[in-house]
Design a protein with these regions (language model features):
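Glycine-rich, proline-tolerant flexible connector loops at the mouths of alpha/beta enzymes
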Residues: 98, 151-160, 223, 296, ...
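Polybasic, lysine-rich low-complexity intrinsically disordered segments
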Residues: 3, 9-10, 23
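N-terminal pre-triad scaffold of radical SAM enzymes
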Residues: 65, 75-119, 125-151
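Conserved Radical SAM active-site core
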Residues: 66-67, 117-257, 261-270, 274-278
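Hydrophobic faces of well-ordered beta-strands that scaffold small-molecule active sites
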Residues: 92-98, 148, 179-183, 213-215, ...
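Auxiliary Fe-S-binding modules of radical SAM enzymes
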Residues: 20-74, 141, 279-423
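Conserved, mostly hydrophobic/aromatic
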Residues: 56, 80, 110, 150, ...
Length: 423
């Protein structure tokens, strides 16, 4: 059976991949894409979906499911890249960030999680003090990072007062550092404990210094799946409600979807549909981030991981379906550098940030990158190698540096594969 390494070598080295990349790169007009699709044998359903996408029309729930069940990778890549280039051209975004993970101790017992430890397993975990967390932040004094990403387990002593004080202390120490922190899983827990509603809680967090919310904790919204893999924590409806209250304050957030485990294709589309509906109402989401299920060191180790082909199909369908989301992100640390590069031709326009080996959430689940860290130079080169323009952004997608004409000294490609370069 082919593994992901074999798939990647086949894709990168295949002449069909080179032709495909050369055909779709810069193919951002309707006529150009229609010409490519006219040379293929498509079902009536796929022709109708392509027509909708190329003319800016929204595809339906049923059409989303049909794409998962019937569309081939090449077709999806052409359409997803069309949407990507309509929105962003060749621009690919990244940021300079670091993660702050207060604890891996957690009151919840999610079946897919390789990171957390229950409170009864304290000897296997950590719980940082406020001072220790601030010491981590201070390590980056003088460094050109723009964001601290705070997320971890749910621990009872980390309550509304604790996180409010933490956010305030970070902003007082370094006002220019954007605080992106906690998911609705944490917020639901601490607000319930404090006996305050979501609207009040989110207002308090904003006043304390919170500036945006990451997309974690979404998993799969539908209770048919959620009750099996994460039954104890907030429901899909509660997750969405917390983001909606945050958006009402004029603030921004991201959204994720955990795919490739026990869910069916229609569960994925249901998940994206709920996000799309909320985005129609609030416009507060910036980025949609599909997260690949990893099966190491968790209670779902018997579930096989999906292939890189399915990863790329999923990114492409997400880009096609999530028409009101500006950005689709691939976490390079989770899927590998090579797959992240491939994803840039399947709808992805953001590959996250430098990380600086500050997260254990990916590596403990068996991610490709066990010590996730890349310099700015490495990230820029990674993007340029596949013919895209590297843009350093801040959390809100303001441009920090356009690296289009920047050439680093001793710019080299990794030796373990050779990518076709598109001019």
């Amino acid at each position: 059976m082919l593994n992901d390494v074999c798939y990647k070598k086949m894709i990168f080295n295949s002449p069909h991949y080179c032709i495909f990349v050369q055909n779709i790169s810069g193919m951002n007009t309707t006529d150009q894409v229609e010409k490519i699709l006219a040379d293929t044998n498509l079902s009536t359903e796929l022709q109708n979906i392509a027509h909708k996408v190329l003319h800016g029309e929204r595809i339906s729930f049923d059409e989303g499911v049909y794409l998962y069940e019937h569309a081939e990778l090449g077709y999806l890549g052409v359409l997803a890249n069309f949407v990507r280039e309509q929105k962003h051209g060749d621009k690919t975004y990244f940021n300079r960030n670091f993660h702050l993970e207060p604890t891996n101790l957690c009151v919840y017992d999610c079946k897919f999680c390789s990171y957390s430890r229950l409170l009864k397993q304290k000897e296997e975990g950590w719980a940082l003090t406020m001072e220790q967390m601030l010491d981590i932040v201070k390590k980056y004094d003088g460094e050109p990072v723009t964001e601290v990403h705070i997320v971890g387990g749910v621990l009872p002593q980390y309550d509304v007062a604790f996180y409010s004080a933490l956010f305030t202390a970070i902003k007082q120490h370094r006002p220019d550092l954007h605080v992106k922190a906690l998911t609705p899983v944490e917020y639901h827990y601490i607000f319930k404990k404090a006996k305050i509603d979501y609207a009040t809680g989110m207002r308090l967090m904003k006043e304390a210094g919170l500036e945006s919310i990451p997309g974690g904790g979404a998993e799969i919204f539908h209770p048919e799946v959620r009750d099996q893999i994460a039954k104890d924590k907030c429901t899909g409806e509660q997750w969405l409600a917390i983001h909606e209250e945050w958006h009402k304050l004029g603030m921004r957030s991201n959204a994720t979807m955990l795919y490739g485990h026990i869910e069916k294709f229609w569960h994925r589309v249901d998940h994206m549909e709920r996000l799309r509906e909320l985005q129609d109402r609030t416009g507060g989401f910036q980025t949609f981030i599909p997260l690949k299920f990893r099966n190491q060191h968790n209670q779902m180790s018997n579930v096989p991981e999906v292939s890189v082909i399915e990863d790329l199909r999923n990114y492409a369908i997400a880009r096609i379906y999530m028409d009101n989301f500006d950005h689709i992100k691939a976490y390079w640390a989770m899927i590998s550098r090579e797959t992240a590069q491939l994803s840039l031709n399947y709808g992805v326009d953001d590959i996250d940030g430098t990380l600086d080996d500050t997260t254990k959430i990916y590596s403990m689940a068996g991610a490709e990158e066990q010590n996730p860290a890349m310099s700015t130079k490495e990230l820029v080169n990674l993007i340029k190698q596949v013919g895209r323009k590297a843009i350093e952004r801040d959390t809100l997608y303001n441009v920090v540096t356009d690296f289009e004409n920047v050439v680093f000294e001793e710019e080299k490609k990794p030796a373990y594969y050779k990518l076709p370069v598109v001019n």
